[in-house]
Amino acid sequence: MQGLSAALFDLDGTLADTAPDLGLALNALRVRAGLAELSLESIRPQASNGVRGLLGLGFGIGPEDDAFAGLREDFLDIYRANLCNRTRLFDGVSELLAEIAKRGIPWGIVTNKPMRFTLPLVDALGLDAGVVVGGDSCRHQKPHPEPLLHAAGKLGIPPSGCVYLGDDRRDTQASLAAGMTSIVANYGYLGDGDAGSWGAQGGIDHPMELLKYLD
């Protein structure tokens, strides 16, 4: 796992703590429906699971329910207006990316978040990624390997030369299927699963620890 040439990152729960603004949108819908707000601690594990996971948490519904589509659009409208109010990079991410840039290591972002949210958020956070792949950039989303392979191709690095850092089982599944070194961001959201059972080659408790996998 030594000597990898490029780094790819998930966004929500890996580079950025987006749960506060996602939670704001969810709680706005709950208050409108006469429900109590949920705590950030209860929202955080679902923050990597997109609208489906958040609406499932907040309202107990899924895409098969009649009310889902309308709530989804309302959620996205609220979130779009509050995209980076309280979202921040995790401690250590700025330092990691600065060191990666200093070493001349190419890096990018591969997220399932739609590009209409991803690009403004990346810009607001001041992230200068060499490639950004969103949930609608390719035919498939993670856990399919296509988005990661697309990003590696854009960087001009073979998949075997890339490390991918993510905080969800789908990140591990996608990166392993792509032939990349898969590392879990143990400081991230992690969902409801046991990260130790995902099959990744390693895990880190602080972003700067990723440097040991890179040239």
Model-identified regions with their sequence ranges:
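Short beta-strand-loop/turn "lid" adjacent to the catalytic site in phosphate-handling enzymes
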Residues: 106
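Generic enzyme active-site microenvironment
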Residues: 8-10, 110, 165-166
